[in-house]
Amino acid sequence: MDFFLYVFILKEKTMAITKEEIQGTKILNEVESSNLVRTEYDTETKKMIAEFKNGMRYEYEGVPHQTYTSFRSAQSQGNFFNKNISKTFPYKKIS
């Protein structure tokens, strides 16, 4: 019984992590992370916007779609973001 309860909780948590909405060329996602709240990715411009829990938003340029897909499926999206996006791609603060 404990095993099935654990799997159910894990499944519910995973479903929350992968919630996304597509609007034209933009993919909008809610993120479960200690710092990130949501992300937005534009498949045409290859720009990714990351919104943090402190309300700050940053736009990262030239993020390949495969990198964004890997970010979305990472076990720890926060760690993946820190290692593979925030320190790799040029960015600017947008709010």
Question: In which residue ranges do the predicted regions lie?
Answer:
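Short, Lys/Arg-enriched N-terminal segments with co-localized hydrophobic residues
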Residues: 1-14
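Acidic/histidine-enriched, beta-strand-rich ligand/metal-binding domains
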Residues: 13-95
